[in-house]
């Protein structure tokens, strides 16, 4: 049993195959089989209207014009070598931007470490006033001991503190 109305014949003059799932060319609007549906497969006279490729550069996202017959990959490669405006070294954000203000030190830090007295920017090694010879508050910073070490020395230890508290309650 045949179904003469089912499917369509390929419009290619040399083929004329009955195809149950024909593909219509979007340029010339004719029906073709799977072997002849491409523009080059049936030598479409209107292919120049549809066969336009404009690849985009993967680096700078600019459209790259491609002439007929040129391979798009080659044209994009040439653009990347010659005309591309993307420069990875120039556009990259620097991570270590805060340079140490101590003479002779060339270290850079991710975060700004400012001295509370002179407000200079220093690295981890030179962030304390004693480490960078801070001149702004020289009277409050002694060379022998810092105020933190003196406060720790004046504070009684756990056992002596407990003993003092017990003496006060006994009296």
From Swiss-Prot:
Residue sites binding Zn(2+) 3 per the record: 100, 105, 123, 126
Positions in coiled-coil regions: none
Binding site for Zn(2+) 1: 10, 15, 33, 36
ZnF (AN1-type) ranges: 4-52, 94-142
Subcellular localization, as worded in the UniProt entry: Cytoplasm; Nucleus
Binding site for Zn(2+) 4: 115, 118, 132, 134
InterPro entries hit by this protein: AN1-like_Znf, Znf_AN1
Keyword annotations from UniProtKB, A to Z: Cytoplasm, Metal-binding, Nucleus, Repeat, Zinc, Zinc-finger
Family matches, as Gene3D superfamilies: AN1-like Zinc finger
Chain intervals for the UniProt region annotation (Disordered): 135-171
SUPFAM superfamilies per record: AN1-like Zinc finger
Residues that hold Zn(2+) 2 according to the record: 25, 28, 42, 44
SMART domains (alphabetical): ZnF_AN1
Residue spans of biased composition, Low complexity class: 136-151
Membrane spanning residue stretches: none
Superkingdom in the source lineage: Eukaryota
One Gene Ontology CC term in the entry: proteasome complex
Protein name: AN1-type zinc finger protein 2A
């Amino acid at each position: 049993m045949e179904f003469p109305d089912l499917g369509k014949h390929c419009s290619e003059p040399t083929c004329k195959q009955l195809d149950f799932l024909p593909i219509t060319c979007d340029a010339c609007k004719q029906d073709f089989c799977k072997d002849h549906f491409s523009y080059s497969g049936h030598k479409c006279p209107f292919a120049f209207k549809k066969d336009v490729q404009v690849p985009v550069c993967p680096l700078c996202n600019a459209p790259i014009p491609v002439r007929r017959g040129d391979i798009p990959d080659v044209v994009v490669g040439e653009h990347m070598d010659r005309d591309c405006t993307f420069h990875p070294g120039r556009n990259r954000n620097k991570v270590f931007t805060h340079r140490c203000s101590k003479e002779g030190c060339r270290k850079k830090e991710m975060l700004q470490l400012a001295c509370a007295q002179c407000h200079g920017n220093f690295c981890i090694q030179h962030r304390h006033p004693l480490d960078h010879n801070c001149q702004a508050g020289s009277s409050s910073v002694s060379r022998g001991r810092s105020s933190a070490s003196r406060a720790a020395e004046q504070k009684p230890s756990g056992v002596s503190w407990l003993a003092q508290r017990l003496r006060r309650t006994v009296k």
